[in-house]
Amino acid sequence: MDELVTTQSFTATVTGSPRIGPRRELKRATEGYWAKRTSRSELESVASTLRRDMWSDLAAAGLDSVPVNTFSYYDQMLDTAFMLGALPARVAQVSDDLDQYFALARGNNDIKPLEMTKWFDTNYHYLVPEIEPATTFSLNPGKILGELKEALEQRIPSRPVIIGPVTFLLLSKGINGGGAPIQRLEELVGIYCTLLSLLAENGARWVQFDEPALVTDLSPDAPALAEAVYTALGSVSKRPAIYVATYFGNPGASLAGLARTPIEAIGVDFVCGADTSVAAVPELAGKTLVAGIVDGRNIWRTDLESALSKLATLLGSAATVAVSTSCSTLHVPYSLEPETDLDDNLRSWLAFGAEKVAEVVVLARALRDGRDAVADEIAASNAAVASRRSDPRLHNGQVRARIDSIVASGTHRGDAAQRRTSQDARLHLPPLPTTTIGSYPQTSAIRKARAALQDAEIDEAEYISRMKKEVADAIKLQEQLGLDVLVHGEPERNDMVQYFAEQLGGFFATQNGWVQSYGSRCVRPPILYGDVSRPHPMTIEWITYAQSLTDKPVKGMLTGPVTILAWSFVRDDQPLADTANQVALAIRDETVDLQSAGIAIIQVDEPALRELLPLRRADQDEYLCWAVKAFRLATSGVADSTQIHTHLCYSEFGEVIGAIADLDADVTSIEAARSHMEVLDDLNAVGFANSIGPGVYDIHSPRVPSTDEIAKSLRAALKAIPMQRLWVNPDCGLKTRSVDEVSASLQNMVAAARQVRAGA
């Protein structure tokens, strides 16, 4: 390397930052653009304001290196694909670049979107780039250079952030005989080398490459590949200083390999997996070690005393130790400031995004100026830790005793074949029964009624009356369409986790704790802070009302224990398995009550089963064991004649196929539309013998599938699953779609089922 732009290190930073806006401004702007209510210039203005405000806030808080290029209209993997020219041919017909971008993200009537799956073990979803033999990489640096220019004009100490080449290719999908995308690595490295020079020419002093794939077992060659890549990038003649960020786990052998390259800084996650043994890596001498010591994924306040002790063991192991969050704060809400309903004790235990930035700055100051410089902050932290440990709300002896008793007596149901016979005699369903996953469109009338209730413009009785009308409308629509098994549509539910959290002991639901799940989809994860209990039934009134309107079976709809954990901010003071069992006990009681009320089918959704799977294979069996046990605890209290359904969505199912079978649900519905039914062969390989409903169309896209298209998917599914075990359903709930889209799609789905059923 001939010339480095700068060698001056930084001391306090974050790995990345959210982009939806503190009041979900980006969600409203993008959805307005999609609906043609907002112009492109208006959308870009909102985006620019959000970026500038975020950079300004981070710099003002005391960070001396601020990440840029973390903003995205939809997803950072899609942004990277655009930057690298890795676009499928099917969008070439779209002339406008932004419309091309959203076509790949969401699809339209002519273009299928990219497949979507979970970002490692988080609840964020990314779009999977497609790499085929015809893919020709070409650099399109307009976005990253434009945002760097904006930030530098604002005098922000800017550090562009880019998904690294190893992670980008390992997370991409080879299509049309293209082989594994990682085989194109050498070709892609040349593009990144060119980008480094451009960033240096445009004023970047540091650049961050995100390589979270290095904490996984995605490829045994990853450590060697990463070392080769960053040796090449570090040798670029004129470039910014390079910081490679690993997060979500322990980089293992990749750490020493990276340290042997010419790069200047390496980030390690000390919250999820890594420990202070990295201090024993001699190759770190001369590097900046960016210590991810403040949890970027959960909302608990950092124990500053403990964090400083960990940091102390790192001093001397590297030329410089900088303090950072463990990962991007994309995964936590913006700030505690809007949460006016928090009691003082609970508030003192928490740190959202803004508070985590403050913790980073405090810890960096302690390293620079000594502990006495932050004595007040350490005292406040110690008081919060003591308050949380002693709070009586954290423990419920009765709940723990009941779990022990039920587990001791067994959580297995009867033989699956005998259950099927009993359920068939009760339900009298046709072959290829049609159903939906649960939720129906959240119409403007539903949202207005919920807002009116929150603002005290209507009372609870009026709200219930309006929601019952929505239930009646959903039942009527399903009967008109000819569906075989109905749902009540969930109009009363704001979210499939928050709805239950608001009724369970041990949870707190935030007012404004929004985080991005994918695109414009935002969720408000509740805070699970203590032992979980169910004070009263949660769904009986709604499901029994819906069942009273029809002779067809209506499914009871519940969220499973693993998903409730995955989509909440969960206590970190006891094993996840213990907390899962507490949630499972509450769900078990609800299933028993539903059965007693005459409900014949109960669905316990576990869309997040894959999400919590540890990234290293050595740790996965233990997780899958307790996850399956929790589901069985939740579902084994009902009779054999009661049919248990479950639903799993956007995941790489291969790694959890055995666990899906072990759940022993009578009917399992899964996402399969974007992945072209590939999961069915995996299920057959593990001897899956229960009924299955592979999603026959993608609800995350506005396009309406044709009858022939759905029939083709069903015929493909029948090659793997016999007709007597195959169900017909969309791949997920319909909450985010319009009534017109839903009606047209379901009409075609029912027609396709009848066509295939008749042998046409």
UniProtKB/Swiss-Prot annotation:
InterPro entries: Cbl-indep_Met_Synth_N, Cobalamin-indep_Met_synthase, Met_Synth_C/arc, UROD/MetE-like_sf. 5-methyltetrahydropteroyltri-L-glutamate binds at R24, E25, L26, K27, K118, R521, C522, W567, E611. One of its GO terms (biological process) is methionine biosynthetic process. L-homocysteine binds at I437, G438, S439, E490, D605. Pfam families: Meth_synt_1, Meth_synt_2. The keyword Signal does not apply. L-methionine binds at I437, G438, S439, E490, D605. SUPFAM superfamilies: UROD/MetE-like. It catalyses: 5-methyltetrahydropteroyltri-L-glutamate + L-homocysteine = tetrahydropteroyltri-L-glutamate + L-methionine. The active site is at H700. Belongs to the vitamin-B12 independent methionine synthase family. This is 5-methyltetrahydropteroyltriglutamate--homocysteine methyltransferase. The lineage of its organism: Bacteria, Bacillati, Actinomycetota, Actinomycetes, Mycobacteriales.
